[in-house]
Amino acid sequence: MKHIVNLLFVISSLSATTINVPSSDYLTIQAGINASVDGDTVLVDEGIYSENLILEKEIVLASHAIYDDLDSEWIDNDNINNTIISGAHNGSCLVIKDGNIGPTIFG
């Protein structure tokens, strides 16, 4: 599994951009998703995010857990436990709009 994850990142990173959330440019996960293009990675820092997310692109949406020392341990359980998307208390927390796309979600 570790090798598959690493391969996905190598392939997606050849011409892809990593968008860090939150940052001065992207305060919300959805802002990062909106700014992304197919092949990009939206990398979410620890925190509680009250958002309803809509994915319409082939991107990687991930917590920092997948980026923490990939050579020795690719899962950081503390980071996963501290990165929460709770929704905005209405509707679905995550909607993938197009059944023909394949976003990747980690951590």
Residue ranges of model-derived segments:
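Right-handed parallel beta-helix/beta-spiral solenoid domain characteristic of secreted/periplasmic
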Residues: 24, 59-107
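Acidic Gly/Asp/Thr-rich repetitive segments characteristic of extracellular carbohydrate-active
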Residues: 17-50
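Terminal export signals
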Residues: 12-15, 31, 93
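Glycine/Thr-rich phosphate-binding loops of Rossmann-like dinucleotide-binding domains
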Residues: 51-52, 71
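Sec-dependent N-terminal signal peptides
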Residues: 3-15
